[in-house]
Amino acid sequence: MLAKRLVPCLDVKDGKVVKGVQFRNHEIVGDIVPLAARYAEEGADELVFYDITASAHERVVDKSWVSRVAEQIDIPFCVAGGIKTISQARELLAFGADKISINSPALTDPSLISRLQDEFGRQCIVIGIDSFFDASSNSYKVKQFTGDEAATKDTQWFTQDWVEEVQKRGCGEIVLNVMNQDGVRGGYDIKQLSLVRAICDVPLIASGGAGTMAHFRDVFIEAKVDAALAASVFHKAIINIGELKAYLAAEGIAIRR
């Protein structure tokens, strides 16, 4: 069994790490590089950085902090935010990022996935999917431009259909951001993640809902995800990564130590 990964997520806005609840009302958490260094020291397996307003504001993630992060940490990290071209992706990889994640730009132009995969290989192409449960239709749907409340919009895609589409186009990994659970620390959406797991042949990362160590255990065992992403429980020091790894190992889960 491959070891499960623990992935702190750092949402970036105006050069600071922020955190909201259900993708709204973001508050400043701290500075990018010190937080990245702290999580690397605690034992994170990798980091994910989302420049949350880049796509909505028609710009690309700021490369200056990408290079500073690369100088300070020795674990892999992924960056996202407004990446729409091969050249933009190449620059970010050259500045030290190990993976590129695209979300809204892929919804606008799905062929971008294939072009990035052809250029760099699927191992470094991650697709972020912002999924919400629509009670009126009793279905999971994909939203776009979620980093800016004013710009957020519905798309034509049902979540499971989009998961299948991005795999056909060559993504190497999927992060499922469950919007209904985000920031509320009530547990991962096991039901939705299990449905996606059944049709997902690439590594699947759960995002949204972590509040206790048991939530990580449950998502690994019940939804069979490859990695668990979390933000507020790490930012607020509710859970220490090293202690979480010890807990998961004691629960019989293969974890990187």
Swiss-Prot record:
GO cellular component terms given for this protein: cytoplasm
Taxonomy, superkingdom: Bacteria
The reaction(s) this protein catalyses: 5-[(5-phospho-1-deoxy-D-ribulos-1-ylimino)methylamino]-1-(5-phospho-beta-D-ribosyl)imidazole-4-carboxamide + L-glutamine = D-erythro-1-(imidazol-4-yl)glycerol 3-phosphate + 5-amino-1-(5-phospho-beta-D-ribosyl)imidazole-4-carboxamide + L-glutamate + H(+)
GO MF terms held by the record: imidazoleglycerol-phosphate synthase activity; lyase activity
Tagged with keyword Amino-acid biosynthesis: yes
Catalytic residues (UniProt): D11, D130
Keywords on record: Amino-acid biosynthesis, Cytoplasm, Histidine biosynthesis, Lyase
Pfam families linked to this entry: His_biosynth
EC number of the protein: 4.3.2.10
Biological-process GO terms, alphabetical: L-histidine biosynthetic process
Subcellular location per the Swiss-Prot or TrEMBL entry: Cytoplasm
Pathway annotation from the record: Amino-acid biosynthesis; L-histidine biosynthesis; L-histidine from 5-phospho-alpha-D-ribose 1-diphosphate: step 5/9
NCBIfam families recorded: hisF
Protein family: Belongs to the HisA/HisF family.
Complex formation: Heterodimer of HisH and HisF.
Cited function: IGPS catalyzes the conversion of PRFAR and glutamine to IGP, AICAR and glutamate. The HisF subunit catalyzes the cyclization activity that produces IGP and AICAR from PRFAR using the ammonia provided by the HisH subunit.
Record-linked PANTHER family: IMIDAZOLE GLYCEROL PHOSPHATE SYNTHASE HISHF, IMIDAZOLE GLYCEROL PHOSPHATE SYNTHASE SUBUNIT HISF/H IGP SYNTHASE SUBUNIT HISF/H
Name assigned to this protein: Imidazole glycerol phosphate synthase subunit HisF
